[in-house]
């Protein structure tokens, strides 16, 4: 018997191939996506309606509902419920037809674009939600650029078609001209505002006429007719029917052709139209998404691209969250499964520290709700209790050592000293700042003078600072004071302290340390930055922090 025949007949080989088949079947059923949008475009509403159609919830709760009504499933933090906005990412898993869908709900505010980027690092697809009356808005543009950095497929859903809005052709042109992204309308709206009658499905050449459900709480009823059915003339006003026919001819004549490869490369966005509040077009979007979306694929690592059916388990931490359950003051690490099969009670290696961990209470995440998880496959997101071991970007694995590409920090634009005016609250203050730093709620920096111990909060936007203060008071019982600093630009120094010492004294900049003890130069404005770059061309300054590996952060 040859070596190949012997190996193929061995129990070990059969066990591995059986496991790989199991993983491959699970991957075929997995889809995941993150939703990005400008505030008030209806992101939380769309999220809830997708859960409604997936059977994960029985009744949708509006964010701005009265207190007697249900709160939104994806908005679990008290401040989110008060303000009606998402300020932290959430994972929601549900089943639809034969697929398991992992939905990552991202913050709806550009001040939290770094949290959005971390979430997109775990996502295989993105859904860009737009208000049909407004089109592209500033924060959508910024979040789109974050998507582009990840080179993932982007699906576009134009929402609020039941309200007066802009011309659909004009909205498509805006995406193509301003984002440099080609568009393909998968369905097309019939009317808008109070004359919105439904959509035409170009895939199946069918007209879907919708009836409103009561406040959009239940699944919408759907009358489906074939294109050319004589009944259409009785159900749709003549001018709307003629307009639909004219616009469809225009799309077929000069519109971009459907190209699945271009979609997967992030060069072509499939476009959908509907109204999440009244459930118009939501299920059509979901069904097309399952057909077009990227399934979990290979991930780049320190030992090469790792295919999802590699039999050893591996994954990376893309988010940390403290106090999801205020009763237990817990800390959860969100992990994206990349390869193999995850099983409860398995023992894994923690790449950054080299330590061995037993994962005894893994959790399936659904907003604030959790249940114990027995297994998970590539593309799934799992929750692990975090006793202070994990940092964002950490890799866990079994088998041979590997590390996935880390998740970088971006240049903050607002800086302030964080003061604790009450010495008796030092312990909860330190604990709160440390845990909020771990989860990436804000970046923490320190004076280069070791005698000064006050933390410097560094954020993309003002709302981040407000959230940190709110959470310190609400979750840790600590009132704090902010002392604004006059900086607006931060740059990391390539080569670290050694390079900085060789350069000597620098003017019009202040040197601080980041969480990992690396030098960061703070500038009052871009002009001061350009001046330093001109005076010291030997300095390599980076707007994105190098990824920390094998290091421990400075203690608060």
From Swiss-Prot:
Q: Name one Pfam family in it.
A: EF-G_D2
Which domain of life does the UniProt lineage start with? Bacteria
Q: Which Gene3D superfamilies match?
A: P-loop containing nucleotide triphosphate hydrolases, Peptide chain release factor 3, domain III, Translation factors
Q: List, alphabetically, the CDD domains matched.
A: RF3, RF3_II
Q: Does the keyword Cell inner membrane apply?
A: no
Gene Ontology BP terms:
regulation of translational termination
One cellular component term (GO) for this entry is:
cytosol
Instruction: Enumerate the subcellular locations listed in this protein's record, separating them with semicolons.
Output: Cytoplasm
Any keyword Amino-acid biosynthesis? Answer: no
Q: Which residues cross the membrane?
A: none
The record's keywords, sorted A to Z, are: Cytoplasm, GTP-binding, Nucleotide-binding, Protein biosynthesis
Q: Which HAMAP family match?
A: Rel_fac_3
Q: What does this protein do?
A: Increases the formation of ribosomal termination complexes and stimulates activities of RF-1 and RF-2. It binds guanine nucleotides and has strong preference for UGA stop codons. It may interact directly with the ribosome. The stimulation of RF-1 and RF-2 is significantly reduced by GTP and GDP, but not by GMP.
NCBIfam families in the record, alphabetically? prfC (TIGR00503), PRK00741.1 (NF001964), small_GTP (TIGR00231)
Q: What is the protein name stated in its UniProt record?
A: Peptide chain release factor 3
């Amino acid at each position: 018997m040859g070596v190949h025949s012997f190996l193929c007949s061995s129990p070990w080989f059969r066990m591995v191939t059986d496991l790989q088949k199991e993983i491959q079947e699970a991957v075929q059923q997995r889809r995941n996506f993150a939703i990005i949008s400008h505030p008030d475009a209806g992101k939380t509403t769309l999220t809830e309606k997708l859960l409604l159609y997936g059977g994960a919830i029985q009744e949708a709760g509006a964010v701005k509902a009265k207190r007697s009504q249900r709160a939104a499933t994806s908005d679990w933090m008290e401040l989110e419920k008060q303000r009606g906005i998402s300020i932290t990412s959430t994972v929601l898993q549900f089943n639809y037809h034969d697929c398991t869908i992992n939905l990552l709900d991202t913050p709806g505010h550009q001040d939290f674009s770094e949290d959005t980027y971390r979430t997109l690092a775990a996502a295989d697809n993105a859904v860009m939600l737009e208000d049909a009356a407004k089109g592209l808005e500033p924060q959508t543009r910024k979040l789109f650029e974050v998507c582009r950095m990840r080179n993932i497929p982007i699906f576009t859903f134009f929402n609020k078609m039941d309200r007066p809005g802009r011309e659909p052709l004009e909205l498509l042109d805006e995406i193509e001209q301003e984002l440099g992204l080609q568009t393909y309308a998968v369905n097309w709206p019939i009317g808008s505002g109070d004359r919105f009658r439904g959509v035409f499905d170009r895939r199946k050449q069918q007209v879907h006429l919708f009836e409103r459900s009561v406040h959009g709480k239940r699944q919408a009823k759907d009358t489906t007719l074939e294109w050319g059915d004589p009944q259409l003339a009785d159900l749709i006003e003549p001018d709307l029917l003629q307009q639909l026919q004219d616009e469809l001819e225009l799309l077929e004549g000069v519109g971009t052709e459907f190209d699945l490869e271009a979609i997967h490369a992030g060069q072509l966005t499939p476009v959908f139209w509907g109204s999440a509040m009244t459930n118009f077009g939501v299920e059509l979007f979901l069904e097309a998404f399952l057909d077009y979306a990227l399934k979990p694929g290979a991930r780049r690592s320190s030992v090469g691209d790792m295919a999802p059916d590699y039999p050893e388990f591996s994954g990376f931490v893309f988010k940390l969250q403290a106090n999801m359950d205020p009763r237990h003051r817990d800390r959860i690490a969100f992990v994206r499964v990349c390869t193999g099969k995850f099983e409860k009670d398995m023992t894994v290696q923690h790449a950054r520290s080299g330590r061995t961990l037993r994962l005894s209470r893994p959790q399936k995440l659904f907003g604030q709700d959790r249940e114990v998880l027995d297994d998970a496959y590539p593309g799934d997101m799992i929750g692990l209790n975090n006793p202070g071991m994990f940092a964002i970007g950490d890799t866990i694995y079994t088998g041979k050592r590997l590390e996935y590409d880390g998740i970088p920090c971006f240049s903050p634009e607002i800086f302030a000293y964080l003061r604790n005016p009450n010495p008796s609250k030092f312990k909860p203050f330190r604990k709160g700042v440390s845990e909020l730093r771990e989860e990436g709620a804000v970046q923490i920096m320190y004076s280069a003078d070791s005698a000064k111990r006050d933390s410097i909060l560094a954020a993309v936007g003002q709302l981040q600072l407000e959230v940190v203060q709110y959470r310190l008071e609400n979750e840790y019982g600590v009132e704090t004071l902010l002392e604004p600093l006059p900086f607006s630009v931060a740059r990391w120094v390539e080569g670290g302290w050694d390079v900085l010492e060789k350069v000597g004294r620098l003017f019009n900049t202040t040197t601080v340390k980041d969480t990992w003890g690396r030098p960061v130069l703070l500038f009052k404005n871009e002009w001061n930055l350009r001046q330093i770059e001109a005076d010291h061309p030997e300095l390599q300054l980076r707007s994105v922090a190098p990824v920390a590996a094998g290091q421990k952060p400075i203690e608060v």
